[in-house]
Amino acid sequence: MEFVTALADLRAEASCPICLDYLKDPVTISCGHNFCLSCIIMSWKDLHDSFPCPFCHFCCPERKFISNPQLGSLTEIAKQLQIRSKKRKRQEEKHVCKKHNQVLTFFCQKDLELLCPRCSLSTDHQHHCVWPIKKAASYHRKKLEEYNAPWKERVELIEKVITMQTRKSLELKKKMESPSVTRLECSCTISAHFNLRLPGSSDSSASGS
C-alpha cells in the first residue's frame, strides 16, 4: 500500500493541472506551479495584461515561464514506475485462484494443476499428491535435467565424431594434393580412411583362389 500511495503522489507531482496527463516539456511559472508548455501557452493565448495561474489563480505580472528539465526526468520515472506497477499487478492476478481469490501456492501432481490452499483441501484433490509450488518446481526441474542428460551426451558424442571426421578429411585432402603422392598411394589412403579393401588386394586374391 505504501508503494501505491507513493506512486499516486509521484503521478500527481508529474501531472499537468490543465490536461491532467503526464507533463510534456514541463515549465514553471512565477507562482511555482508546473504545466505542459503547450497547455500554458494555450491558456494564456488571448491574455495581455495579467496572466493568472490556471491552478491557484495567482496573477503573474508577465507571460514568463522557465523550462524544468528535472521535472521532465521525474515525469519519465513516474511513467516507467506506473508501467511496471501495471505489469506486476497483471502477473499477480495470473497467480490468483479465480474461484477463491487466493494466491496459488500448491501443485497437484496428478492433475498437473496449480491450487490455492482451499482448492488443495477440496474433494477434487482429496487423495492426490499435492505439494507446495517450490517443492514441485524443484522436483520437475530435476526430472527434466535427468531426461535431457542422455540426449546431451549423445549430442556431445556426435559433435566429437563430426570434428574428428572433418579433421581426417582435411588431412586426406592435403595428402592427396601433395605432388609427391602417387595414384596408388592416394587409393590406399582413401581406402584406409573409409575402411575399404582395394580390388586386387591380397585378401581379394586369396579369396578368389
Curated annotation (Swiss-Prot):
Highest taxon listed in the record's lineage: Eukaryota
Signal peptide bounds: none
Record carries keyword Thylakoid: no
Zn finger region (B box-type): 92-133
Positions contributing to Zn(2+) binding: C97, H100, C119, H125
GO cellular component: cytoplasm
Key words, A-Z: Metal-binding, Zinc, Zinc-finger
Biological processes per GO annotation: innate immune response; regulation of gene expression
Any GO MF annotation of the entry: zinc ion binding
Record-linked PROSITE patterns: ZF_BBOX, ZF_RING_1, ZF_RING_2
Zinc finger intervals, RING-type: 16-57
Transmembrane segments: none
Pfam families: zf-B_box, zf-C3HC4_4
PANTHER family: E3 UBIQUITIN-PROTEIN LIGASE TRIM
Name recorded for this polypeptide: Putative tripartite motif-containing protein 61
UniProt source species: Homo sapiens
